[in-house]
Amino acid sequence: MQDQYILALDQGTTSSRAMLFDRQGNIVSIAQKEFEQIYPQPGWVEHDPQEIWSTQAGVAAEAVTRTGLNGTSIAAIGITNQRETTIVWDRETGQPVYNAIVWQDRRTADFCDSLKKQGLEAKVRAKTGLPIDSYFSATKIRWILDNVPGARDKARQGKLAFGTVDSWLVWNFTKHELHVTDVTNASRTMLFNIHTREWDSELLELLDIPRSMLPDVKASSEIYGHTKTTVFASKIPLAGIAGDQHAALFGQMCTTSGMVKNTYGTGCFLMMNTGDKPIESKNNLVTTIAWQIGDDVQYALEGSIFIAGAVVQWLRDGVGIIKTAAEIEALAASVPHTDGVYLVPAFAGLGAPHWNARARGSVFGVTRGTTAAHLARAALDSIAYQSLDVLAAMEADSGISIGELRVDGGASANDLLMQFQADLLGVDAVRPQITETTALGAAYLAGLAIGYWKNLDEVRSQWQLDRRFSPSMPKEQVEQRMAGWQRAVRAAKAWADDTQ
């Protein structure tokens, strides 16, 4: 297997990517293709499932061929994906019955409110580790069954399949043979009991979702099957699956209880490994399965921030104060602070630990002296503030004081943001040499399943430091800024709640 590589497929919210990794965990090749975001109505977000598949298959082939290799050089494929995004398709034709409803989509918020009013939140959280929220897959499936003509009848007849994006990719890679998912993706549906690790019949009944639609649930690291498509001439083992944040936690080698990572992508996703026992959150965090390797199941606490890097995209595309996302660091660094300006980027509601679906983006503290640079700095700062809110909740739930924060994702390359994050936290923000930890985690899971890497210790030894950011801001300054942020969040919530 010396000259073979692991192919990681990273199907994200805005693009499909593929990366080849060698035995040392180095990236040998990358291919990426963006795809269309569909916004049929305010608060609705969709993708075309066929475009998800075509772009992912395309970059998989491209990543391999651009290095002069072919399918025989691939030892295994690992898949990681945007979670919760919901696809329902016809088992016979393989055609989706509706567009993919994306994790950011809020169309089922009212239905979620009605479930909460029935007093079901405690039951759902006890079983799934999740709050009732339109973010998760369950109510999206229900919406498709209720709103696509003929869908419910077909589902009752066993003719429809539901899958998160990983399931859809495996289904297509195996020419409609395998309908599977892994425990991490299943744990994000609001239908999966994280204690028994089975689909929960009571929740399925409650939401009127037929069991026959659901995929078989597997470990995150095992050989599920082999590719059968024309993308590769040879049969390649599909051997690792994990939702993007779980894969990043693994890629960051947060393999012991109390270790935390933050992935700064479109949103921010913080996850803490809590070991082999699920901790029920008292602070509006999500309890989830970190991964399963063999019979070993690790659990995690997670806080999701809906808008992180997306606030930079908004400054570029919506407001036009920067032309490229890369410009923001220099613009923000041109002022020493925001001059009292706070931006609460609740464009799609507030995520953890607030979970307020109706809050909207707000800017406070604006004066005639406020400039584009102040707005840019406030936008970057908002990413760090939101992360701090989640980390404080994690410490409260777990009883563990965080020793350091491992960072990755696109915005972790922003030194100004990383330094401010360390200042707010009062602990080091630690950036690894390979920040593509999501894809790396998927590669590790697949490689371990086929013996490409011997064991966890071999994989753990590959993690290498790029830079450590240590706190340097005086405590009084930190407290003053945090108080301003908390005031801004309270004001954003008040605006959302005042609908008289």
From Swiss-Prot:
Q: Does the keyword Membrane apply?
A: no
Q: In which pathway does it act?
A: Polyol metabolism; glycerol degradation via glycerol kinase pathway; sn-glycerol 3-phosphate from glycerol: step 1/1
**What's the catalysed reaction?**
glycerol + ATP = sn-glycerol 3-phosphate + ADP + H(+)
Give the enzyme class. transferase
Keyword annotations of the record: ATP-binding, Glycerol metabolism, Kinase, Nucleotide-binding, Transferase
Query: Which BP terms does GO give this entry?
Result: glycerol catabolic process; glycerol metabolic process; glycerol-3-phosphate metabolic process
Q: Return the EC number.
A: 2.7.1.30
Chain sites annotated for binding glycerol: 83-84, 135, 244-245
Q: How is its activity regulated?
A: Inhibited by fructose 1,6-bisphosphate (FBP).
Q: Which HAMAP family match?
A: Glycerol_kin
Protein name (record): Glycerol kinase
The organism of origin for this protein: Burkholderia ambifaria (strain MC40-6)
